[in-house]
């Protein structure tokens, strides 16, 4: 996308043929976040990067309970890493709060709840019980190892969250025990 390499993709689970793309920051313009409508035909591309960091790589994009609720995270040091939108990417709010300065590799809202989030970081899994802008309080998960974690997935059939780590394997926990 405009000279950048795609680093994250999210297909909307709510709207047919709607896809979000995040990029790295190799171009002079820095990283981008793009919403593509009509991905199966004559696409409509909308840059939804305004207000987001440019000196980083988009590591993950996820939706909440609808396409208006978005969470995006960045992988770099010295930047604000986690952002949410409640209006489909028109505007963004940083929710780093008290999170240490480290890359965030994956982010997701808690299933069915846009006020809670779970993230995978350079130092393990963190969660918040209340997204509250710059006052968001992040807690390291006691049930996952303190090691670089690259991806999280939620399995709705049994309420399990899986965390893929770098060097410690795959860990699972019920969402309620996080």
Task: Specify the residue positions occupied by each region the protein language model found.
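Conserved blade-ending motifs and adjacent loop-strand segments that build the rim/top face
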Residues: 2-6, 53-58, 96-108, 136-156
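Residue-level detector of Asp-centered blade-edge/turn motifs that repeat once per structural unit
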Residues: 11-16, 63-67, 109-114, 155-157
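Residue-level signature of beta-propeller blades and closely related beta-rich strand-turn architectures
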Residues: 25-26, 39, 76-77, 123, ...
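A short loop-to-beta-strand structural motif that recurs across blades of beta-propeller domains
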Residues: 30-35, 81-84, 124-126, 169-171
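Conserved Ser/Thr-centered positions that define the repeating blades of beta-propeller domains
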Residues: 36-38, 64, 85-86, 92, ...
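Beta-strand initiation motifs
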Residues: 40-46, 89-93, 133-139, 178
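Blade-level signature of beta-propeller repeat domains, shared across WD40, Kelch, NHL, RCC1
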Residues: 126, 140-178
């Amino acid at each position: 996308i405009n000279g950048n390499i795609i680093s994250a993709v999210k297909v909307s689970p709510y709207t047919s043929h709607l896809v979000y793309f995040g990029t790295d920051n190799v171009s002079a313009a820095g990283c981008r976040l793009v919403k593509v409508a009509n991905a199966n035909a004559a696409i409509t591309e909308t840059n939804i990067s305004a207000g987001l960091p440019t000196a980083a790589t988009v590591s993950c994009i996820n939706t909440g309970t609808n396409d208006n609720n978005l969470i995006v995270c960045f992988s770099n040091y010295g930047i604000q890493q986690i952002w949410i939108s409640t209006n489909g990417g028109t505007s963004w709010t940083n929710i780093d709060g008290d999170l240490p300065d480290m890359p965030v590799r994956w982010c997701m809202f808690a299933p069915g709840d846009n006020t809670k989030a779970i993230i995978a970081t350079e130092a393990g899994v963190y969660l918040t019980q209340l997204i509250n802008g710059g006052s968001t309080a992040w807690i390291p998960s006691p049930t996952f190892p303190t090691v670089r974690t690259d991806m999280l997935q939620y399995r709705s059939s049994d309420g399990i969250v899986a965390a893929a780590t770098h060097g410690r394997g795959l860990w699972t926990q019920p969402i309620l025990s996080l």
